[in-house]
Amino acid sequence: DRSPSRGLGDVYKRQDYKDQGDIEVEIWRKYILNCAFNVMTAFYDNTIGELRRDPVKAQQYEKLVWEAASVGQAKGVALTDEHINEVIHKFRHVHADNATSSLQRDFRIRRKQTELETFSGYIVKEAKRLGVSIPLSEKIYQGLMEMAEKF
């Protein structure tokens, strides 16, 4: 078969292009990382190292990752346990101890315009819409909203 589409498919394979599902998974892997990374560093005003060293905070970080992933899965994103565990591995072993987040820095300077809705509000609203339970995400979002109201 020498059809143009077959030839194009061969080019894509050689170039290691990803299909739409792969792209969606990659976007959500990055997103679920940020749902925990930005939210936890801002909520506690801690570096990643400080979060890692506190067993309660580390457990909360990982729970936020799983909660965000459950919303992605409910939306039909093909996130696997392996994808989710890779995000958790980055938290435990890859991110620099002194790493902070843009949301944390926004909260430190009491900036009115933040990424709170992007990394927390959206996931909470989508979970409600989809009937997915994410109690820790809801609790921390509410706490961050209360903090932001004082800016």
Label for each model-derived stretch:
Residues 1-12:
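Single conserved hydrophobic/aromatic residue that forms the stacking wall/gate
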Residues 62-151:
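NAD(P)-dependent Rossmann-like dehydrogenase/reductase catalytic/cofactor-binding core
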Residues 51-55, 106-107:
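Short coil/turn segments at secondary-structure junctions
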Residues 19-21:
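Short loop/edge segments at beta-strand edges and connector loops
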Residues 24-49, 56-69, 95-96:
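Active-site-proximal catalytic alpha-helix in oxidoreductases
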